[in-house]
A protein has these predicted regions:
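NTP/phosphate- and nucleic-acid-binding module
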Residues: 1-514
Length: 514
């Protein structure tokens, strides 16, 4: 099945089973804004719990904050967002559609990669097991020609972006003969910058109102609270501050479902270190964060690093952890060595001394910062994408199952009476009453047991319990495993300990300590 078709099925599945809905759905929705349904909010909360505990619970020198969405507008001047938080936009005069110029060029680069992959696929089919991909890439004339064009475009594109050369971006689009996906024409306007921050006014009257912004990132809320946390918590460097919160960006080209939205949630940790040690800490956090992702069990081939060749002016190292989505490898987390840029800027603009006194060195300095930043919604999408499986069964049927990591599953356990009589529903309710304090449980008595299993498979429930007539005699139930569909008889008194070992966040966190 084509990856595009799989992605469409995942989007449809999210709506059908209560994971994600278009926001304001009864009013035909609002572009690039989504709501999380009853299953989605549970999965999302479990993702956040896994991250929060891995940061704050497992590290004595990391604490949390929850900063306000509205902050003093000068903060965004200091951070550079007012002057430089822009996207290069271009319009097609025929379709009247607006695009990000950089995205159009990135898509063109991706088309070159696609051409190379098609050449490789044809050669693989022709030569079979004897095919040597590395040799083919290095010697095939057609591949080398496409590769040269792609590299030349990439170099030209990177230079234009780095220099902020809008005329060159437009010229690249013209030279590459990039067409509008809607009109199919090359009738483009000039490229211009568009600031991504949402603004509003705070105050009771128009004359006295202050222009404020919906924060475009959560990091600045950590930086301006760094000194408060350090002093009240008696924190010694190195230490970190973690935060989970909403951020807002007026994305013109918001696409790929919840991958790029205008309202989204971030999980960020800023780690404050002694200048000169930042690259060592960058390497440590780079490895630590990849291990956190891989602990979910989707396989090493789903992840890769993308080290930044071109760095922001304030950074001296940066990498992305990319995940294999249905539409290719995409960033889910960024790790950046931000030097002392943010804190120095806030010291300059606020006029306050925010230097740290290091008792070991007996000197004051502005700490350097290592940042780890995840988009919760992107993480959610990566997990859904990797978990969605259409599985052919021996009887010729196909079941749709979400093979979610058990610790993150919205519902951990479904309890089902075999029939709706003979005291079985009452017994099932009794079992749920004993387990609901430990797990998110669901009771289901409608339809055949097979259909009920399929419903639970579709929302990713790791275990199902069936209460039958024998249960009333021996106090045992049938425990069904979602992934293997194996069924075993288990004593009711042993259910909690058996299931807890498989589905708890604690069990997942312990794998990070190995």
């Amino acid at each position: 099945m084509a990856q595009e078709d799989i992605f469409k099925k995942i989007v449809s599945h999210c709506k059908e089973y209560g994971f994600v809905f278009p926001s304001s759905d009864i009013y035909d929705g609002l572009g690039a804004v989504y709501d999380y349904g009853q299953m989605g909010v549970e999965l999302k909360n479990n993702i956040k719990e896994y991250w929060w505990k891995s940061m704050v619970l497992l590290h004595e020198n990391i604490v949390g904050v929850d900063s306000a969405i509205f902050m003093h507008p000068t903060i965004w001047k200091a951070s550079g967002h007012v002057d430089a938080f822009n996207d290069p936009l271009i319009d097609n005069k025929d379709s009247k559609k607006r695009y990000r110029a950089d995205v159009l060029i990135e898509d063109q680069i991706a088309k070159y990669e696609e051409k190379i992959n098609k050449e490789i696929a044809k050669a693989q089919k022709r030569f079979g097991e004897a095919f040597d991909e590395a040799q083919f890439r290095a010697t095939n004339g057609r591949v080398l020609e496409i590769q040269a064009k792609m590299e030349a475009l990439h170099t030209r594109f990177a230079t234009a972006l780095n220099d902020g050369n809008l005329e060159e971006l437009r010229q690249i689009i013209i030279d590459e003969e990039i067409v509008c996906p809607i009109s199919g024409t090359k009738n483009w306007t000039e490229v211009r910058q568009f600031n991504l921050m949402f603004s509003t006014e705070m105050g009771s009257t128009a004359d006295g109102a202050m222009k404020v912004y919906l924060r475009p990132e959560t990091a600045q809320g950590i930086f301006v609270n760094y000194l408060n946390v350090q002093k009240t918590g008696r924190m010694k460097i190195p230490f970190g501050i973690a935060q989970i919160g909403k951020a807002f960006r007026n994305e013109i080209v918001a696409r790929q479902f919840i991958f790029r939205m205008r309202e989204f949630e971030q999980m960020e940790m800023q780690f404050f270190v002694r200048p000169g040690t930042e690259l060592e800490w960058f390497k440590t956090w780079k490895e630590t964060r990849l291990k956190w992702h891989k602990a979910l069990g989707f396989g090493d081939d789903h992840y890769r690093y993308h080290d930044h060749e071109k760095l922001a002016h304030y950074a001296n190292a940066a990498t992305d952890i990319e995940f294999l989505m249905p539409f290719g490898f995409k960033e889910v987390e960024g790790i950046h060595s931000r030097t002392d840029f943010d804190l120095s800027q806030h010291e300059k603009y606020s006029g306050k001394n925010i230097k740290y006194f290091d008792p070991e060195l007996n000197e004051n300095y502005v700490p350097y910062v290592i940042e780890t930043s995840i988009g919760v919604d992107r993480m959610f999408l990566s997990i859904m994408s990797a978990s969605y499986v259409e599985e052919a069964l021996e009887n010729g049927e196909t079941r749709v199952v979400l093979k979610l990591p058990a610790a993150l599953a919205p519902v951990k356990l479904a309890v089902m009476p075999l029939v709706k009589k003979d005291g079985l529903p009452e017994k099932a309710r009794e079992i749920i009453d004993g387990l609901k304090f430990h797990f998110n449980c669901q009771y289901d008595e409608k339809d055949s047991i097979g259909k009920r299993y399929r419903r639970q498979d579709a929302i990713g429930t790791p275990y199902c319990i069936t209460v039958d007539h024998q249960t009333l005699e021996d106090e045992c139930v049938t425990l069904r495993n979602r992934d293997t569909m194996e069924q075993t008889r288990v004593r009711i008194t042993e259910l909690q300990s058996i299931i807890a070992d498989k589905v708890s966040i604690t069990a997942l966190l312990k794998t990070l300590q190995l």
